[in-house]
C-alpha cells in the first residue's frame, strides 16, 4: 500500500480516488486467492465513505495539515491530469473504469438534450477548477454530466499574487481572488490537441514517449497577440474530435492587459482559437477579480462583445453569458434582454459574490486580516439562496424559454432540486465538491432520481421551473 503514503498525493480528491482504487484492489486480490466474497453494490459504500471523509479525512486536510488550498488543488489536478493523458493505457484505463463504477450513475430519467448536445445528467463541473483543461477527458469518469474549462483568456497571465484562495470552513465557503490565472487560449488548444493525439497514438499502437504534463512554452504563449483583426487568426479545426462522453464547455474571460474598450476583440481572439474545441462557450463578464470586468455587464459594452462573437459564430456553437449575483434586478433584466436580442443559448447564474454580510467567518487565519479586508469573491453555501433567486427571476422573465445553468451553493440533492425547480436546466458545482468529496456527485444524482419518482415525473426536464408552473396554477 505504498501509494497511500506518497507525499505527492495529499488532496482530498486524490486520497479518495486512491481509496477507491485500494478497495477494488482488495476485492480483486481476495477473489484471485479463492476467497468467497458476496457481490456488493457500489451504492452500499457511498454513505460510509462519505462519513469517513467528512468526519475524518476532511478535518485533517482542512485544519490539521493547514496546507495551502491552491497547492492541494494543484496536486489534485496533477493526478487527474496523469489519468487523462494516459487514459488509454494500463493502469490508468483500469483506474478509470473503477472510477466510473464508483462515481457514475446512468439513468434515463436524468438525461436530457439541450442545444443539440446530450447531457447524461444535469450536474456539471463549474469553471475555475480545470482552467487549462489538464483533466478535460476525466470528468465524465467522476460522474459529471458535463464540464466547463477555464476561465481562459486570450493572453496567458499569472493571475493575482498568492495567497489568493482561502477556505471559510465555518461557512462551507471559499474566498478566491485568483484573477484568471491560465496559460492562455492557444495553450488550451495545444493541450486539448495533445489529449486527442495521445488517444490516437494508443489506438494506432504508437509509442507514447512521455507522461510529462504539457507545459506551454514562451513561443506558444506569444504566438497570438493583440491587436486583433478578422484576418489575424485562422486556427485549423481538429482533424479528429476528442470524443468525450460528456459535453465540454469553455469559459472565456478578458485578459487583464487588454483595455476595457478592446474587450470585444480579446474575447473574439479566444473564441476563434477555441471554437472548434468546445461544445458550448460562456462569456465571463462577472468575475470580481479582474479590474473593471464587471462593468462589461453594462448593456452597451456587453452588447458589443456578444454581437462580435455571434458574427464570428454564425449560430454554430451555443454561447451563454455568466452574470454576477450582486446585480440589481433591473440590471439582470437588461442582461436577459441582451441575451434575447443576440440569440444567446442561455445564461449561467451566478458567479461569486462580493458580499460579506452573510458570513460567520470574521478573520482569515492565513493572513490574519478581517474577511471584509480581503478582496475576492465568495462561493459555496452562502451563495445558495441568492443564486436561486436570480435563477427564478430569469426563468420568469423569459417564460422558461432561455436555458439557465444554475451554480452557487449546491451541496445536496435538495440544493440541486431547488435550483432546477426554480428554472435551471443544468447545474454546476465546485466548492461543494471540494467540501463533500467526489461521492457527492453520485449522491446528488441518486437524490434527483428519487425526487422525480416521488413526484411522478419521468424526466428531469419536467422538473425545470416546476415552482413557477405550480405557482401559476
Language-model-detected regions and their locations in the chain:
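Glycine/Thr-rich beta-alpha phosphate-binding loop at enzyme active sites
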Residues: 93-106, 285-301, 340-400
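Glycine-rich phosphate-binding active-site loops on the catalytic face of alpha/beta enzymes
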Residues: 148-154, 346-353, 421-443
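Alpha-helix-loop-beta-strand connector modules within alpha/beta enzyme cores
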Residues: 173, 183-186, 191-199, 298-319, ...
